Curated annotation (Swiss-Prot):
Catalytic activity: 5-phospho-beta-D-ribosylamine + glycine + ATP = N(1)-(5-phospho-beta-D-ribosyl)glycinamide + ADP + phosphate + H(+)
Ranges for domain ATP-grasp: 109-314
Cofactor stoichiometry and binding remark: Binds 2 magnesium or manganese ions per subunit.
This protein's name: Phosphoribosylamine--glycine ligase
Enzyme type, top EC level: ligase
Gene assigned in the entry: purD
InterPro entries linked: ATP-grasp (IPR011761), ATP_grasp_subdomain_1 (IPR013815), PreATP-grasp_dom_sf (IPR016185), PRibGlycinamid_synth_ATP-grasp (IPR020561), PRibGlycinamide_synth (IPR000115), PRibGlycinamide_synth_C-dom (IPR020560), PRibGlycinamide_synth_C_sf (IPR037123), PRibGlycinamide_synth_CS (IPR020559)
Organism: Methanocorpusculum labreanum (strain ATCC 43576 / DSM 4855 / Z)
Amino acid sequence: MKILVAGGGGREHAICLALTKNANVELYSVMGKKNPGIAKIARESFIHAETDVPAVLAFAKEHNIQYAVVGPEAPLEAGLVDALTKAGIGCVGPVKAAARIETDKGFCRGLMNKYGIDGCPAYKLCNTPKEAAEFIREYPGDLAVKPTGLTGGKGVKVMGEQVDREGAVEYAMTLKDQVIILEERLLGEEFTLMAFVDGKHLVPMPLVQDHKRAFEGDVGPNTGGMGSYSLENHKFPFVTEDDYAKAISIMQATIDALAQEGSPYKGILYGQFMNTKTGPKVIEFNARFGDPEAMNVLSILTSDFLTIAEHIINGTLSANDVSFEEKATVCKYIVPMDYPDKPHAGDVITVGPAENTILYYANIALENGVLMTLTSRTMAYVGIGASLAEAEKYAEAACRNVSGNVRYRSDIGTEALFAKRIAHMKELRS
């Protein structure tokens, strides 16, 4: 079975490793920069922009690709799935119209409003920076300020966190030539719920919590994600059964709404939720696996990913097709020392021994047997254990054995940070 994976990050390395557990998979890759982990296991790699739809389509046809899995959001927005599907290649990933759930935040909020879907925060769309600035100045509370398009997870500024009111105004004024969305600031604990979706049915994956801030203690600028964790029971103590059921219901209602709009959703749906005093609210939807969250869930996937992909493509997915090991995971990203502001490329890094972990390469170069940093997140270790403490211990030990001009967040997955999350939610709801 010839499978094409589009994308070359840590998420895509995880997708490729999960697929190739099936000996019948013949893996092909298209990626903008060569990922040495993917290149090692692929039959052939096409080093080319994944958003160049005609070129990717030609590569797929040349190699008689049967199925494709699209990792990042940019090729979804470019219409890669539409082109591959038209050519008879089954895809794990939504068509462009359905991917708007991520690529156009205004569309997402409008869809939730139109169909009365729960969990939508109060929001306002502004067509000019001036309009946004005026609203920010007049609004009595705190707001999240974001462009409606793709920002790589780094486009939001939240009043009371990264900026004050004047800082929010200044940021809004920089967002020229795009629609700006202003949303009420949500207070609570974030969690990620990803699901496999076949157009009608969803099958959830373990809950994951990501850590966007660059530095320990959840401070510093937002990043693409410095690491994440999941628990052995696949839930969180700060997400009640009612909260969880509501989050599932919100995602199912969103899938139903997209089908009603004439754009059935097939692929991975990622719900980023803020669990507030009154229950989960949707921060955003993504139209693909999270990065790093994909590495947590795919590291403990026990069912065959190729079979899941076939059921997604054929519209025959059921809960019986998906199973995960009852293990905890902790993912810690190794990044260039000055990431995300001024990361330096070309620094040599060495990797030491690691136990009970999986290493996923991301934005990294391998030249003459030497690993070197590039300008984004370098690589990630996922520790796997019977408990969060055990998984964190393995991930931490592996990261400590990496040397070079790099850093990581040692607090991700620790008992102290986890206890802080639980206490915060308890205080919020007391």
